Amino acid sequence: MNREQIANALRQNQVVAYPTEAVFGLGCNPQSESAVKKLLDLKQRPVEKGLILVAPSLDFFRPFVDFEQINDEQLSRLQGKYERPTTWIVPSKSTTPYFLTGKFDSIAVRLCDHPSVKALCELTGFALTSTSANLTGEPPCRIADEVRLQFGADFPVLDETVGDARNPSEIRDLRTNQLFRQG
């Protein structure tokens, strides 16, 4: 499928697969509880774990992130350019839905400059949820055909290429810089 078709599927609260910096991600509209529930069911992922949001700019995160709790140094870190993709755990707004934050008072966000992510966010007007496109026990998909093998020939997949990163993103706490997952 092309970008416009995938954007339409996202607007219709479908779960889609799209390329990111290292692997294909599964994503949906983060403001749609029904879409997020479909995603969690598909991945057999407990809601308590929370989800990552990706977008090309901070503006897409404004509905979810409590920027008043982020100081200038932390904001600079959040906007920094790094050797590897970096996901940051940041304070969430009290209005951010539980189905995104899980059991936490924070949310995971990643500024992503991958052209596919940038285009989908700009076409839809929202950030995307992002979890690796793979079934439990299977390796993450790096090409569109692998997504179709795992999720079926009719699964909505943006047929573009992943970036050059070798590993999924590093995950760090923005306030403490604590490393949760090595990238």
UniProtKB/Swiss-Prot annotation:
Keywords: ATP-binding, Cytoplasm, Nucleotide-binding, Nucleotidyltransferase, Transferase, tRNA processing. GO terms for cellular component: cytoplasm. SUPFAM superfamilies: YrdC/RibB (SSF55821). It holds the Pfam family Sua5_yciO_yrdC. It comes from the Bacteria. InterPro entries: DHBP_synth_RibB-like_a/b_dom, Sua5-like_dom, TC-AMP_synthase, TC-AMP_synthase_SUA5. Its EC number is 2.7.7.87. One of its GO terms (molecular function) is double-stranded RNA binding. It catalyses: L-threonine + hydrogencarbonate + ATP = L-threonylcarbamoyladenylate + diphosphate + H2O. It is an enzyme of class 2 (transferase). It is found in: Cytoplasm. Residues 1-183 form the YrdC-like domain. GO terms for biological process: regulation of translational fidelity; tRNA threonylcarbamoyladenosine modification. Belongs to the SUA5 family. TsaC subfamily. Required for the formation of a threonylcarbamoyl group on adenosine at position 37 (t(6)A37) in tRNAs that read codons beginning with adenine. Catalyzes the conversion of L-threonine, HCO(3)(-)/CO(2) and ATP to give threonylcarbamoyl-AMP (TC-AMP) as the acyladenylate intermediate, with the release of diphosphate. This is Threonylcarbamoyl-AMP synthase. It comes from Haemophilus influenzae (strain PittEE). The lineage of its organism: Bacteria, Pseudomonadati, Pseudomonadota, Gammaproteobacteria, Pasteurellales. The gene is tsaC.
